Each structure stands twice: as C-alpha cells, then as structure tokens.
Amino acid sequence: MQQSLIRDFAHVTVWIFDLDDTLYPPEDALFPQVSAKMSEWLMRHLHVDATEAARLRDYYWRKHGTTLAGLMAEHGIDPWDFLNDVHDVDLSALRPDPVLAAAIARLPGRKIIHTNADCIYAERVLAARGLSGFDAILGIGEAGWHPKPDLRAYDAIRAAVGFDPVEAAMFEDAPRNLAVPFSQGMRTVLVGPGCDGPKGLPMPPEAMAHITHRTPDLTEFLHRLAQGLAPVAL
C-alpha cells in the first residue's frame, strides 16, 4: 500500500491545500463560529429572523456556492464588509502542529493554500497552527470572487500560480470542491469524514467517484507520502 501511494503521487510538484477543517481538525470548532457570524450578518443586514437566515444560506450555497457569493450576486454587498465581520473569530482553540508542519515541509515542490476565505484570515489561522513556508496563499479575492466549486475559481488560481493540473494534488474536506480538480487531472485527497453542505451530511459513495484518495488523518497521510518522495528540481 505504501509503494502504491508513493507511485500515485510521484509526479506531483504542486500541493494545494484547503484551509478550514483541512489544516486543522473540525473538532477545533472554528468554522461553527464563522457560520454563526454569517447567520447573524444576514439577520442584521437583511432584516430576517434566524430561520430565514438559515434558509437563505442553504439557498445561496446551493445556487451560488457560498453564502458570500449569493449575497454578492443577489444583493450586491461589499465582500470585505462581510468577510471582516464573519472572520473576526476566536482562534484560541487552534494549537501549533509541528508534526503537520514538518510533513508539509517535506513534500517536494510548491505548496499552495486555496481557500474560500480571505488571505488575512488564512494567515491568522496558519500562524495559530504554526504552519508556514507556503509558496502562495490564495483566497476568494485572488480567485476573482469566484468560490470553489466554481470552475472559474480553479482557473484563476492556476493562472496566478502557473502549473499543470496533471502535476498537482489537492487536499479538501468538502467532496464537491474536488470534482473540478479531478476533471482537470489532479490527484484529489478528501480529508476527514466526507461531509458536505451546510447541514454537514455525509456524501453517498456514488457521489464521490472524483475522489482518488481519502484520509481521516492528514498528518499521517502526508508523513507516509513524504517518506517515499524524492525532492524535485524546480
């Protein structure tokens, strides 16, 4: 199994990581804070109650990909007003993870963050986790305000970084965000239990044919991988 895993990634020179619930455990309960703030923002600015805010968020997620994308498309909001508010969260639950940091550092090639959040928030989270050395941190603004799983988001990131998708691997906790990378030829790694959507429901197996690898433990997966991969010339 170890040799098969190494063969599957031997060609990879670009490693792309999602942020929330991928580079820290979901049990750190950071995203629930963000989620609550999103609902509060809708209640405050759209003058709706909690039930309607939840309904709108589900609708925006299904139609536009994210709550922010829906608000921009249907209400023309300033994205920074929203992002600065919902990402003002307590990061004290996050702890440095030197083992994960070392595993990422050992991967041969470039390491990229691609998140639907903004770069300022991403940098705060990475600092709290003790993760550094990424070649690029690309957020929703760098993706032209197109969120994953929108094809335009991936195209914008690829244009910004400059890489061949067949030489890349992407790590994500949301199954649907790996469909486009898979179609472009990337290795796709689902991190965690494989839940998706605002309700956190597990995805049925037939809906995950675009997942090439799965792991409940990103650190252990990367450690096994890095052990057998040789450095690449960039």
Give the residues covered by each predicted segment:
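N-terminal helical cap/lid subdomain that shapes the substrate entry/recognition surface
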Residues: 7-17, 22-99, 119-120
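Short glycine/serine/threonine/alanine-rich loop segments
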Residues: 48, 77, 109, 163, ...
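Catalytic-core regions built around general acid/base machinery
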Residues: 99-108
